Swiss-Prot record:
Belongs to the class-II pyridoxal-phosphate-dependent aminotransferase family. Histidinol-phosphate aminotransferase subfamily. This is Histidinol-phosphate aminotransferase. It comes from Dehalococcoides mccartyi (strain ATCC BAA-2100 / JCM 16839 / KCTC 5957 / BAV1). The gene is hisC. Its EC number is 2.6.1.9. It holds the Pfam family Aminotran_1_2. Keywords: Amino-acid biosynthesis, Aminotransferase, Histidine biosynthesis, Pyridoxal phosphate, Transferase. Pathway: Amino-acid biosynthesis; L-histidine biosynthesis; L-histidine from 5-phospho-alpha-D-ribose 1-diphosphate: step 7/9.
Length: 358
């Protein structure tokens, strides 16, 4: 019997593009020690107390706190935002998805500023919304006038990454305010906040259309545990809490975040080291005549290849045990992105790139 399951699947997903995630280190075929510079993780790892807590934890058979009450209390102290305005999720990705589920009816529009974080488009289309792209300029800065011109009665959300990923481009608070003044609900993604020190939190009382996302994946060394949080107007936080699955932050992640917040000064010291190393990496990459690095305020640097093919360089680096991200989308043709790691990671990358340029 032939059974056609496909006829029951949503027709709008037939040509849906999945997300191309980074390769897990254990899948890399190399005898070399892996230097993982492809996913903007903190290579210093989690705080020592997190690792200790994980080894001693004995409640994996118990469901976690569905409201993440202790995490939210600690985050309230950290951010200065009221507990009832904080919502936690399985990475900020889940919160992006939930926001789109909350705001989007089929055909509603979401303004996106590519090249930028791919999950804005991913979840918009998954939730039957329409992406309206307002491209950045050649230096990857946003075009506020073009955003204004793109707004229609169907516009429900604007996504702004601050700073932008994958380009590392900064955006000023004044520019964000100009976007907020347009009156559309706006999500400011501060995934890399700890590396910049710039936040829009103090503007939340003035702008009821401002929503902020953050994550523990980049600065806190918890990428594998998937924890993010958002700072929202009370009405949005209430709706998100209602539609969010209750156990999305698992019990191991809950325990790890608690320890991270208690040891945040330790983790912020690793952030300072990464910021210092970022400057060294940028300076050294600038010396290669075949690479054009772009200024970055995050924990990675985007480079355009002026000679050669980015995909071939990525494969050559992988054969040496060095994992980097390759991009070839519009406005990012023939580009590589290097996460900033420890000094020894930078040394290994620079040595490998130097050998290729010889």
């Amino acid at each position: 019997m032939t059974y056609n399951l496909k006829k029951y699947i949503r027709t709008d997903l037939e040509d849906f593009d999945g997300y191309s995630a980074c390769k897990a280190p254990e899948l890399v075929k190399t005898s070399k020690q892996i230097i993982k510079l492809d996913a903007n993780e903190n290579l210093y790892g989690a705080a020592p107390t997190v690792r200790q807590a994980m080894s001693e934890f004995n409640q994996y058979h118990i469901y976690p706190d569905a409201t993440q009450s202790e995490i939210r209390r600690l985050l309230s102290e950290y951010t200065g935002v009221a507990v009832e305005q904080i919502v936690c999720g399985a990475g900020s990705d889940q919160l992006i998805d939930l926001l789109l589920r909350l705001f989007i009816n089929p055909g509603d529009e979401v303004i996106n500023c590519p090249p930028t974080f791919a999950m804005y488009k991913f979840y918009t289309e998954l939730n039957r919304g329409k992406i309206v792209n307002v491209p950045r300029d050649a230096s990857y800065n946003i075009n506020i006038a073009a955003i204004n011109n793109a707004i229609t009665p169907q516009t429900k959300l604007i996504f702004i990454a601050a700073p932008n990923n994958p380009t590392g481009t900064a955006i000023s608070k004044e520019e964000i305010r100009q976007i907020l003044d347009l009156g559309v609900p706006t999500v400011v993604d501060e995934a890399y906040y700890e590396f910049t020190g710039q936040t829009m939190v103090s503007d939340m009382s003035k702008y009821p259309n401002l929503m902020i996302l953050r994550t523990f994946s980049k600065w806190a060394g918890l990428a594998g545990l998937r924890v993010g949080y958002g700072l929202f107007p009370p009405i949005i936080a209430d709706y998100l809490s209602r539609i969010k699955d209750p156990y999305s932050v698992n019990i191991a992640a809950d325990a790890a975040v608690r320890q991270t917040m208690l040891q945040r000064e330790y983790m912020l010291e690793t952030v300072k080291k990464i910021v210092n190393e970022r400057q060294r990496l940028y300076t050294e990459l600038s010396k290669f005549g075949w690479l054009k690095p772009y200024p970055s305020v995050a924990n990675f640097i985007l480079c355009k290849l002026l000679k050669g093919k980015a995909k071939e360089v990525q494969h050559e680096l992988e054969s040496k045990g060095i994992l980097v991200r390759c991009f070839d989308a519009p406005m990012m043709e023939n580009c590589l992105r290097f996460s900033v790691g420890k000094p020894e990671d930078t040394d290994g990358l620079l040595k490998a790139l130097g050998e290729m340029g010889e």
